[in-house]
């Protein structure tokens, strides 16, 4: 619980930079030191872009924001960077919604859609941990984020001012401390407190900080803090004594009572002006609607210090003038930080598009009396604001976009040679006629030599149909689509990497950045259908998924050689020639990238978040003697079956006590373990 202020990165890796990496590291580091605002790293798949950037980070020793365009890749980057920097603060900041339906109004149908959401508690904890690390004074902080980082947050100054600082032996009134906790949105739970909750037992307060997994025990003696101890909330095991403790707010929108009163007065004034305008235009329905909703929110703020949708009043709470950019995660970084934009050809356009969609939806809400005009200032950054805020940027992509190339002055740092000596996979064009039978035969060949395959279709329906066809043909197959939750996507990728499935079918979910060295075959159906998913950049990205395997091979099913296909063939030939020449000059024999099961589990570790939450919720963890299905591979058959019997007894007991959700969970665990044990036996 102590506040660390280490300022040095410690890069941990058994490897040394090789191939093009030393030259790229030197160029990027020098560019930052020379004050270059934008740089672009053009790195082919498997060239070690993450390792290269990790070396740059370690040499520059600055706080870093790493941006990715989706949660799956952010999770992978988070896992990899935690491996490279196990002794530093590597944090994770993505949207904490498992499901999110934004508030909206459809005038043509006169239909209001209320905001509906489901928050993932584990990701909320990781977000709070990220902001806590940034405000802790540490310099060795890496935050891996999606575009969530450009959306509004509470003020870092206000958030920092609310931090409760404790020290063993300090004077502190117990009741005053409890009131402070409640003002930081902590909730009392005297049974089994979880993240953001506390319990009181006489002069002892047990608290689970919102950004921590471990709990803090504060023992009072009169008006003095007698001791601070870190302990496991599940087992009660004391893990150590602390001299200091810092308790951060449980929510990211906080304001002290005085500022909240000022904000409420400003909201009242804006409401009065808006009501006068609506009534003068004879829009009485909108006026009544706005007054009812706003006064209800004000009453909630008065009584609780918080209301649902309080972020829509963030302009008043932070005291910003109308139209000023929102406060966001970038404001939590110190001045000397730098930004790394992964897969920049996708991430930068995504940042550019966020503002327009948000503005369009909220304008309708304001016009029809669902929100005050100030709600328009609860928004993501405009792209121009983002560019003004980022001090120095390194863009990473195998296929950089026009914007980053322009910003970098047309210069790129190239990573074409892989440390493993692997060449870009050969690309072959085959006719569409008979493509499914041909593809099935190709898949079976690659599975027979212990490899995996990715198959890309044009539509979700085609993916589903192809998935069903492969399953009937005896192929262990899964498909990814946009409705699968981010953490579940990571779990599916883990299944592919761990050998539970052999083929993944998808549309647009497997292109950028996925680290899948087991994949040796990439098949692209309808490759000659020119468009967003079949242009040069997309085809190069998809083909790159096979570039981490010595037997990598790409098949394009097409009847016409389009301009995009020809450019892919030409660029692949150019890169292969450079790579082959380098290997010959340095006596390098190409080899596949190999990762252990432990590395697979570590790099996809965020996918465990939901599972850990469920296990904690049902009291299934931690128990030293319990090893559930995710770890059954490490058991002897005798011990495995003994654990299954124990789980079966717990399942029956849970059913008898009508704890049906727990019983169903245990049933699924038993089934998974039996499958693993049967496979190994």
Curated annotation (Swiss-Prot):
Q: Which residues form the UVR domain?
A: 641-676
Please name the GO terms that the record assigns under molecular function.
ATP binding; ATP hydrolysis activity; DNA binding; excinuclease ABC activity
What span is annotated as the signal peptide, if there is one?
A: none
Q: Which family, according to UniProt?
A: Belongs to the UvrB family.
Cellular localization per UniProt: Cytoplasm
UniProt keyword terms in alphabetical order: ATP-binding, Cytoplasm, DNA damage, DNA excision, DNA repair, Excision nuclease, Nucleotide-binding, SOS response
| Start and end residues of each Helicase C-terminal domain | 435-601
Q: Briefly state the protein's biological role.
A: The UvrABC repair system catalyzes the recognition and processing of DNA lesions. A damage recognition complex composed of 2 UvrA and 2 UvrB subunits scans DNA for abnormalities. Upon binding of the UvrA(2)B(2) complex to a putative damaged site, the DNA wraps around one UvrB monomer. DNA wrap is dependent on ATP binding by UvrB and probably causes local melting of the DNA helix, facilitating insertion of UvrB beta-hairpin between the DNA strands. Then UvrB probes one DNA strand for the presence of a lesion.
For the motif Beta-hairpin, give the residue ranges: 96-119
* Presence of the UniProt keyword Chloroplast in the record: no
Q: What is this protein called?
A: UvrABC system protein B
Residues that coordinate or bind ATP: 43-50
Tell me the PANTHER family matching this sequence: UVRABC SYSTEM PROTEIN B
Quaternary structure (record): Forms a heterotetramer with UvrA during the search for lesions. Interacts with UvrC in an incision complex.
